[in-house]
Design a protein with these regions (language model features):
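Positively charged n-region of N-terminal signal peptides that target proteins for export
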Residues: 1-4
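Boundary at the C-terminal end of the N-terminal hydrophobic targeting segment
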Residues: 19-25
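Bacterial N-terminal signal peptides
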Residues: 8-18
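Exported/periplasmic cell-wall-interacting domains
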Residues: 110-238
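Primarily extracytoplasmic ectodomains and periplasmic/lumenal surface modules that are beta-strand-rich
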Residues: 75-79, 85-89
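Extracellular/luminal recognition modules and glycoprotein regions
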Residues: 26-62
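N-terminal post-signal-peptidase region of extra-cytosolic proteins
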Residues: 50-68, 80-81, 96-110, 114-121, ...
């Protein structure tokens, strides 16, 4: 009887050790995975304590109905505008710490260029290695159409607004700023957020001599972007 009991104990111990070894070598899920909801609970309160004074000063309710981020490549700035009634109101400006390449649009994978155009946010990434990030829908319809007319392929992708201070082909605004932009986008709804990226502020300059990438369709793109920026006025006069 004692021998049978000992065999059973040894068998159960063996099974437990096997199970432990399997679990150790086959983790069920990577550690540290967070959801957008968790970010809003953990980071939301402190980010919104910094955000709301901007909206109070601008006279816009928070969260707003729609938001536009304007990325100014030459100025290394990201403006935030919110819809109030039928007009757009300036809210805040963030510094851009990292944006590789020069003035001019992105045309292919690996060129290091930050895209230029009007984009939507398609994804909020709470597990980015750049703290937090927001994915843009580059290449958009215009990008694809111009690539087709040029006979180009391999346009690249995975363009983000993200934290940290360095980037290649994306826009890095630092951890503090991306927390605010991430929370603002989540509260507003990604379908209500637009991102306009321009080589320089068309509201202040007519043409910038530093532009070296000049495909035949560039004037059409810049005319379109200029018309878009005209909806937001000049922030210095607000």
């Amino acid at each position: 009887m004692k021998r049978t009991f000992s065999v059973i104990v040894l068998f159960l111990l063996y099974c437990a050790l096997c199970a432990f070894g399997y679990a150790a070598s086959h983790p069920s899920a990577p550690a540290g995975k967070r959801t957008v909801a968790e970010i809003l609970r953990e980071i939301g309160p402190r980010a919104e304590s910094r955000l709301k004074p901007y909206f109070d000063k601008a006279g816009v309710s928070y969260p707003p109905s729609r938001v536009t981020f304007i990325g100014l490549k030459d100025e290394l700035e990201l403006e935030v505008w919110a819809e109030k009634g039928r007009r757009w109101v300036y809210v805040a400006t963030y510094d851009v710490y990292g944006a590789s390449g020069g003035l001019g649009p992105k045309q292919k994978a690996g060129d290091g260029q930050v895209p230029e155009g009007i984009y939507n946010v398609t994804e909020l990434n709470p597990n980015s290695r750049f703290h937090l990030s927001m994915k843009l829908d580059y290449p958009n319809g215009f990008d694809r159409l111009m690539a087709q007319s040029d006979g180009r392929s391999h346009l690249g992708g995975d363009i983000y607004l993200h934290g940290k201070t360095k980037s290649k082909g994306c826009i890095a605004v630092g951890d503090r700023a991306i927390e605010e932009l991430f929370v603002l986008t989540a509260r507003t709804g990604i379908k209500n957020v637009k991102v306009v990226i321009v080589p320089y502020d068309f509201r202040s300059h007519i043409f910038h001599s530093a532009i070296r990438i000049t495909p035949s369709w560039l004037p059409d793109l810049y005319e379109k972007l200029g018309q878009e920026l005209a909806n937001y006025g000049q922030r210095d006069h607000i």
